UniProtKB/Swiss-Prot annotation:
Pfam families: CysR_MRC2_N, fn2, Lectin_C. The lineage of its organism: Eukaryota, Metazoa, Chordata, Craniata, Vertebrata. Residues 1450-1479 are annotated as: Disordered. N-glycosylated. Glycans are attached at residues 69, 140, 364, 588, 954, 1029, 1350. Residues 1436-1479 are cytoplasmic. There is a cross-link at residue 1142 (Glycyl lysine isopeptide (Lys-Gly) (interchain with G-Cter in SUMO1)). GO terms for biological process: collagen catabolic process; endocytosis; osteoblast differentiation. The gene is MRC2. Coiled coil: none annotated. The chain crosses the membrane at residues 1415-1435. This is C-type mannose receptor 2. Keywords: Calcium, Disulfide bond, Endocytosis, Glycoprotein, Isopeptide bond, Lectin, Membrane, Phosphoprotein, Receptor, Repeat, Signal, Transmembrane, Transmembrane helix, Ubl conjugation. Residues 244-360, 389-505, 528-644, 678-809, 832-951, 979-1107, 1132-1243, 1273-1393 form the C-type lectin domain.
Length: 1479
């Protein structure tokens, strides 16, 4: 046995092994993991056309086997959460070795660790990776960064076995939990429970049989869970039932989801978000809400860009219960809530905020599609001037009358104002009756009961078709009657006394032998103006369908508007499970779809995730639950039925108005917009570095529309090619990595919940050209808007509330719409000092006003001096129409923290509040106005419409704090604290020593000091970090004798850190030199206030204070903690931190911290935040911390799984979905892609047991080597012996005796890991040997195992030819991580040994002691401990039985607890028990 190898374990260790093994055998339970799991349909086999076999997992390895077997678990795969691919045989996830520069990474099966990036795959590129790693025959790959068009390259060789579907055909969709203790968070699949892995919802652990899942990876560790949604035909579990209407309701008070997530959760239960269509239903809901305090999502939304408010379940919007002043801000708040505080009143809110929600369903409802409208036109007799349709007669009354007079006129003719009950009837009225008339009365009104619309003829309201933002003013008694207007026949509520034409309707007289009118169609064909339609019932290929229609003198069907779509859907209603060919195709595989006639596609009705990613294909209509939706199918192999359409020439009835006229090619573009001679539109990119200038999709759409433009739509490759070139001219043609995470909103979206998850362009252009990035796996339920990715020049699905840049598009020859056309609005900019100002008299909300200012490269005005205030006041008196008129200025509170900010980012150094203003800080954003006749300010709701003032300046503002002083000149007295080149002292520990501001300043002057001046975030961080033991507020040197704040030395205020709602003190008098408002630093226990500033009365309050003076050159400086030396640990409060100063990705930093028995840092409070700010500023580099976002989400959590009680986000953050967080040099938290390399990170060193590792690997490391432990890192173990200075040969021998080899380094991350650990030994050795040799046969360097050196990190001047010889050895420097060549003899270095992780040693009889007496003792101890284990198990199971026996079926519990107060329940404890405990 070589020296250094661990000695044989003594017999007590064998005893413990015996006990554990027998105990495990005793506790083990039969049955394969997941036996109780729900059978899942999304399991598939992966087939390779190139290798002619299926992917199989065996023993941790992956291979392709020619024997495909659908019943063999090792070949069964499924997509699971976080883009991982799960194998049902191994119960593991597909992955590779840790990614590095080595391209020969091994493919294998790994534990499904949540954080491991090497387990994540994109379904579109999985085939490429499998071909590369398994050696399948491949074709060329398109060059990164080029403009692709969704082509399948090597991925096309990999398909789902038994079909032609690609590997994205069975994607994973998030499953949102109900009840439990996870606030509605989605399941984490797979998850571990009771040492078993589950790849779906399970009933294991529950005797009631209800399915549940964990919402974190390991239930046993976190105990986070929820019930799984199930589709059932009853309302027994989790539902309240209204016996009168037979509707069922589910109140999810403890969940917090966005509107779209809540809608998906309801849909997963065969339900929808709550719709309220009757007063009785509102009353019933109010009764269920009694006693609760909550705001909950309902199905009301305004997400259809071409329509108005609607219910997500397609119920008619006929009853409304808006609160007063609602809906407001309709352009940005598109989803509805019901509020208990207003007795069930409704409000509109931003759809992205997280709230509880209510689901609704009808029991015994099926998944069958809604029955189609009746389109058959039965013959009826009508009087002259009346026109027949479906048994009724209709007439246009051209004379303009009020609604009541119009109704009387209809009654005199034997009818009533028209009622509309279907899309078919609406089409007839729009085409045949309305014709060219712009707006007419219809019979809908709410005259009898406010907010409850009904038809004047008494018929049931079963169909509504509102205009965008309508109905919006129903609460006004003057808007009780409804009109129909516009080319699509949408509806608007209007004042009843308005004079308009109208439409009458009455029952018709059935004709003798009344039969359907055929309008000349052949037998078996169906008429719909202006064509005849025929269903071909044979299943044929696309070319055969074309030929068959041609043989009948017709063509495959074209669909040009929503009316034709509704009619065609009615034709195929009874053909469930079938497909029908249409004339839409991409036969040439261009990526653009066209009708066979060559016409452009002006209307589309795609199914979810269609038209997909591949180019080419032909379009068929689906049936069943996807009735009438369009899907792309293979033109040659897929067989479907077909629909022929035969035009009868001249339309019998007028057609709908066509789309807007096609713009001219000769029209000019507005200034600043670009175009190409072949394009009919002009384009402009709106981009800014500032987060506050970026916009959500809805805001970007509004910004374009305010200019008279639309968000970019792309109808062809040529159009997108021009836009790509335009972007390259602006941002440069760099490598894709340079432009990573730079996205631009385009108009493509699937926000409308009634659109079947179909992508649509916001400007109404048909979605016929597609270029989605096939490497993205973004087909989940919540990414409803699309972006153009600058790096790949392709499209990516994104959450609509993400703040991004955008691109607008406007027709040639169109002028950009100015915000104000009045003479006053067109006044020139007025100049004052170094800025220009413009006064806009038209009224806008605060956000709209700010947006208009940005069009002129300006902002809403900021005010920084009395002179500037006087200038504004003087001009306001000229522009204002009333003395008390209010004008918006740029001051506003942030929604994230309630702090006041100027829109231009300038410092708040001047205030002019009116008496009683500003109002106390609340949860709603506040915006500030200036009064015309007085020089004072007030705050009010930002949605109020006011005139406003814009300001622009060419003066550049300092954005970064100044550099640190190079050295501290001198030191501080013993009772003072030194920070850089200043000394500080906190006074006021005793209550009697707390004084007024002037007395504090005098006390400091007596010590040759002054009250502290805080000039940058670094000094502020030092002050805040000094506050944990301070229990009182502290005066600082900031004060205001006039209206502007300044420091005691009359230094201008260049940095501020005001608390939420501050400065808010009384405005100082304009005259007088004595300070009346002075600032304190708050010690508040609230994280939002700690260390912030507040302005207080200088003469009426007493506080502690902080004195400051310069260092004394005669004194020695204190040891400087900043910047810290490499490898040093810093202690603060109860925490210890290690700073990593290396180029690291986030996951690399996490691994490196874990190799130090630490984790990435957790920031629990503003004190620790201030301490880390000093560290980041001292190193002059951003630092990773342990806060990361869930995949594709802006939900962020600590890797240490601590609660997220404190955050330090920069405004607008977290911006990056699924990103990682760093502390920037100014202390603010920002997010970026986890793959970004930053130059440092912060580890939080645990004082207790090592934290659980977030990334796991097979095997373990030996217990120890002499006096040095083995350190695990990825797949290997390392032992550092830098105290031993050995020659190269001796180092090799020592590592061989330990079972390993001298250090080899295979990629950059491994080099960083070694370098980080070597820095701890920098004083003992200048470096460590590398196990590298020169191979004279190949003339190359090889590692000790003869593998080639594919990665290197040579220091200057590099590796010369003279160093490539048998006599050369190589080493790594401790202080730099660089590699050096040198001689093999007469040089000694430290030793680092490396060996692969080993599997846990199995139990072996040879490990038992040989002494018979010892054996007897072992066996007796085993029996004794086994008896104890058995007793414990019986008690445990009895307790389980008691817990579960108290609950026979999960009962629905409507709890009013907030999420933070919600009781966290183990899955084995029933809801009933928890309710009883609370009572």
């Amino acid at each position: 046995m070589g020296p250094g190898r661990p000695a044989p374990a003594p017999w007590p260790r064998h005893l413990l092994r015996c006990v554990l093994l027998l105990g495990c055998l005793h506790l083990g339970r039969p049955g394969a993991p997941g036996d109780a799991a729900l059978p899942e349909p999304n399991v598939f086999l992966i087939f390779s056309h190139g290798l002619q076999g299926c992917l199989e997992a065996q023993g941790g390895q992956v291979r392709v086997t020619p024997a495909c077997n659908t019943s063999l678990p090792a070949q069964r795969w499924k997509w699971v959460s976080r883009n991982r691919l799960f194998n049902l045989g191994t119960m593991q996830c597909l992955g590779t070795g840790w990614p590095g520069t080595n391209t020969t990474a091994s493919l294998g099966m790994y534990e499904c660790d949540r954080e491991a990036l090497n387990l994540r795959w994109h379904c579109r590129t999985l085939g490429d990776q499998l071909s590369l790693l398994l050696g399948a025959r491949t074709s060329n790959i398109s060059k990164p960064g080029t403009l692709e068009r969704g082509d399948q390259t090597r991925s096309g060789q990999w398909r789902i076995y038994g079909s032609e579907e690609d590997l994205c055909a069975l994607p994973y969709h998030e499953v949102y939990t109900i009840q439990g203790n996870s606030h509605g968070k989605p399941c984490t699949i797979p998850f571990k429970y009771d040492n078993q892995w589950f790849h779906g919802c399970t009933s294991t652990g529950r005797e009631d049989g209800h399915l549940w899942c964990a919402t974190t990876q390991d239930y046993g560790k976190d105990e986070r869970w929820g019930f799984c949604p199930i589709k059932s035909n009853d309302c027994e579990t989790f539902w309240d039932k209204d016996q009168l209407t037979d509707s069922c309701y589910q109140f999810n008070f403890q969940s917090t989801l966005s509107w779209r997530e809540a809608w998906a959760s309801c849909e997963q239960q065969g339900a929808d978000l709550l719709s309220i269509t009757e007063i009785h239903e509102q009353t019933y809901i109010n009764g269920l809400l009694t006693g609760y305090s909550s705001t909950l999502w309902i199905g009301l939304n305004d997400l259809d860009t071409s329509g108005g408010w609607q219910w997500s379940d397609n119920s008619p919007l006929k009853y409304l219960n808006w609160e007063s002043d609602q809906p407001d801000n309709p352009s940005e708040e598109n989803c509805g809530v019901i509020r208990t505080e207003s007795s069930g009143g409704w409000q509109n809110r931003d759809c992205s905020i997280a709230l509880p929600y209510v689901c609704k369903k009808k029991p015994n409802a099926t998944a069958e599609p809604t029955p189609p409208d009746r389109w058959a036109n039965v013959k009826v007799e009508c009087e002259p001037s009346w026109q027949p349709f479906q048994g009724h007669c209709y007439r246009l009354q051209a004379e303009k009358r009020s609604w009541q007079e119009s109704k009387k006129a209809c009654l005199r003719g034997g009818g009533d104002l028209v009622s509309i009950h279907s899309m078919a009837e609406l089409e007839f009225i729009t085409k045949q009756i309305k014709q060219e008339v712009e707006e007419l009365w219809i019979g809908l009104n709410d005259l009898k009961l406010q907010m409850n619309f009904e038809w004047s003829d008494g018929s049931l309201v079963s169909f509504t078709h509102w205009h965008p933002f309508e109905p919006n003013n129903f609460r006004d008694s003057l808007e009780d009657c409804v009109t129909i207007w516009g080319p699509e026949g949408r509806w608007n509520d209007s004042p009843c006394n308005q004079s308009l034409p109208s439409i009458c309707k009455k029952a018709g007289q059935l004709s003798q032998g009344a039969a359907e009118e055929d309008h000349g169609c052949r037998k078996g064909w169906t008429w719909h103006s202006p064509s005849c339609y025929w269903l071909g019932e044979d299943q044929v290929t696309y070319s055969e369908a074309r030929r068959l229609c041609t043989d009948h003198g017709s063509q495959l069907v074209t669909i040009t508007n929503r009316f034709e779509q509704a009619f065609v859907s009615s034709l195929i209603y009874n053909w469930e499970g079938e497909y029908f060919w249409t004339a839409l195709q991409d036969l040439n595989s261009t990526g653009s779809f066209f009708w066979l006639s060559g016409d452009e596609v002006m209307y589309t009705h795609w199914n979810r995730d269609q038209p997909g990613y591949s180019r080419g294909g032909c379009v068929a209509l689906a049936t069943g639950s996807a009735m009438g939706l369009w899907e792309v199918k293979n033109c040659t192999s897929f067989r479907a039925r077909y629909i022929c359409r035969q035009s009868l020439g001249t339309p019998v009835t007028p057609e709908l108005p066509g789309p807007d006229p096609t713009p001219s090619l000769t029209g000019s573009c507005p200034q600043g917009w670009a175009s190409d001679t072949k394009l009919r539109y002009c384009y402009k990119v709106f981009s800014s570095e500032r987060l506050q200038d970026k916009k959500s999709w809805v805001q970007a759409q509004g910004a374009c529309q305010e200019l008279g433009a639309q968000l970019l739509s792309l109808a062809s490759y040529e159009e997108e090619h021009f836009v790509a070139n335009m972007l390259n001219k602006i941002f440069g043609e760099s490598e894709p990595e340079i432009h990573e995470q730079h996205w631009f909103w385009i108009g493509l979206n699937r926000r409308d919940p009634r659109g079947g998850q179909s992508w649509r362009w916001s400007d109404g252009v048909g979605f016929s050209y597609h270029n989605f990035d096939r490497s993205r796996h973004d087909d989940d339920d919540i990414r409803g808007c699309a972006v153009l990715d600058l790096a790949s020049l392709q499209w990516v699905a994104m959450q609509c509330d993400t703040q991004l840049d955008w691109i607008c598009k406007i027709p040639r020859g169109t002028d950009v719409r100015e915000p104000d056309d009045s003479p006053q609005g067109r006044r020139e900019w007025l100049r004052f000092q170094e800025a220009e100002y413009k006064f806009f008299e038209h009224h806008s909300t605060w956000a709209q006003a700010q947006r208009i200012c940005t069009w002129f490269q300006a902002e809403l005005t900021s005010v920084h001096s009395q002179a500037e205030l006087d200038f504004l006041s003087h001009n306001l008196q000229k522009f204002s129409r009333a003395q008390e008129q209010h004008w918006w200025i740029g001051l506003h509170t942030s929604e994230s923290d309630g702090r006041f900010r100027w829109t231009d980012g300038s410092i708040i150094n001047f205030i002019s509040w009116a008496p009683g203003k500003p109002r106390p800080v609340g949860k709603d954003k506040k915006c500030v106005y200036m009064t015309a006749s007085r020089e004072d300010w007030g705050d009010q709701r930002c949605l109020t419409a006011l005139p406003y003032i814009c300001k622009r300046s060419n003066v550049t503002k300092e954005t970064q704090p100044p550099d640190l002083p190079t050295t501290a000149l001198g030191g501080c007295p013993s009772d003072w604290i030194q920070f850089l080149n200043k000394c500080f002292q906190v006074q006021g520990q005793e209550p009697q020593s707390r004084v007024k501001w002037s007395e504090a300043q005098f006390s400091c002057e007596q010590q040759e000091a002054q009250l502290v001046t805080i000039t940058n975030p670094l000094e502020q961080a030092f002050i805040t970090a000094s506050l944990p033991n301070v229990t009182f507020d502290l005066w600082i040197g900031l004060h205001a004798s006039q209206r502007d704040f300044q420091w005691v030395e009359q230094e201008p205020l260049m940095y501020a850190n005001w608390a939420p709602g501050e400065p808010s003190g009384p405005s100082p008098a304009p005259s007088g030199n004595k300070p009346t408002s002075c600032a304190v630093v708050l010690h508040s226990p609230s994280a939002h206030f700690t260390g912030r500033w507040d302005d207080r009365s200088c003469t009426e309050e007493t506080h502690g204070f902080i004195c400051q003076k310069g260092t004394d050159p005669s004194l020695s400086p204190s040891p400087a903690a900043l910047p810290p030396a490499p490898g040093t640990e810093l202690s603060y409060l109860n925490g210890t931190f290690r700073l990593l100063q290396k180029p690291l990705r986030w996951h690399d930093a996490l691994l490196l911290c874990e190799s130090r028995n630490a984790s990435l840092a957790y920031v629990p409070d503003p004190y620790t935040q201030a301490f880390l700010t000093q560290a980041a500023r001292g190193l002059r580099t951003p630092l990773w911390i342990g806060l990361a976002g869930e995949e594709g989400s802006r939900r962020y959590s600590w890797v240490s799984e601590e609660p997220l009680n404190y955050v330090g986000w920069q405004d607008g953050e977290p911006q990056q979905p699924g990103g990682c967080t760093y502390v920037d040099v100014d202390g603010a938290w920002r997010t970026t892609s986890c793959d970004t390399k930053l130059q440092g990170a912060v580890c939080g060193v645990s004082s207790g047991p090592p934290p659980p590792r977030r990334i796991s690997y097979h095997g373990s490391c030996p217990q120890g080597l002499a006096d040095s432990a083995w350190i695990p890192f990825r797949e290997h173990c390392y032992s550092f012996h830098m105290e031993l200075l050995l020659g190269h040969k001796e180092a090799r021998q020592r590592c061989q005796r330990a079972g390993g080899a001298v250090l080899s380094i295979l990629d950059e991350m491994e080099n960083v890991f070694v370098w980080e650990h070597l820095q701890s030994y920098e004083g003992q050795s200048r470096g460590a040997w590398l196990g590298m040799n020169f191979n004279p046969k190949g003339g190359t360097l090889v590692w000790q195992d003869n593998t080639a050196v594919n990665y290197s990190n040579w220091g200057p001047p590099g590796l010369g030819p003279s160093m490539l010889s048998h006599n050369s050895c190589y080493w790594i420097q401790s202080n730099s991580g660089l590699w050096r060549p040198g001689a093999c003899t007469n040089i000694t270095m430290g030793v680092v040994c490396k060996l692969p992780r080993a599997e846990q040693s199995s139990f072996s009889p040879s490990a038992l002691p040989e002494n018979p007496a010892a054996l007897v003792v072992v066996l007796m101890a085993v029996l004794l401990l086994l008896a104890l284990l058995t007793a414990a198990l019986i008690l445990y199971r009895r307790r389980q039985s008691i817990e579960r026996g108290a609950f026979e079926g999960a009962r629905y519990s409507r709890s009013s607890s907030s999420p933070t107060e919600a009781t966290e329940k183990n899955i084995l404890v029933s809801d009933m028990e928890m309710n009883e405990q609370q009572e």
